[in-house]
Amino acid sequence: CSISYENYETVRAVPYDMMISGADCKAVSVLRLWKAVDTTNFNMNLFSQGQYVKAIQETSNAEVISKVLYPSDDHDEGKLLRLTQQYFLVSASLQSIIADHLAAYGTLGNLAEKVAIHINDTHPALCIPELMRILMDVYNYSWEAAWSVVTRVVSYTNHTVLPEALETWNVYLFKLRLPRIYMIIEEINRRLCADLWNMYPGDWDRISRMAVIGYSQVRMANLSVAASHTVNGV
């Protein structure tokens, strides 16, 4: 089935590359940073009418995304901005990776052999559903084909075993900001729970602990474990 997007906000991601050299090394690593830029032109009509704040606000909403990384999240506005930032950085990086890969090889058929994405803690865990989205919605992969690629590309490092320290997102806020990504996570969770039921029939406590979605929360660590070919802890 085809997916159409409605009532979305378009943001341009502008890359800034920092070259990092090592001691006695002939190679240079690249650290790519991203800036969010609004795609709409400055509204001169509003400005000419004296609506200065509104004219500026229309172009500054997108730029807030990369203005201050990870603001306070003790209120819903902060949580939504933090979620937006995580998605922005993940999506921009993945689109850059795929564009570079296609430029080099002309096909995504060997993506899993040429690309490795490591989730170091859960902040970039949205790369899992976002890569699924790109493969399915943009390149017409089936679910099974896209999942096969994702689970061969992604690995994960977990940094804590304390349940209260593991990153989770409220389902309501998640659906509000990233509806398509939530749809994909829902399907990941459904398939995971079905597999867990086959392995542990009747053990609802175990399955509920391992599920990606539970108690109105999206559990990013569980998502990372479910989609990674390798997991380690530090």
Each model region followed by its residue ranges:
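A conserved ligand/cofactor-binding region detector
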Residues: C1-V234
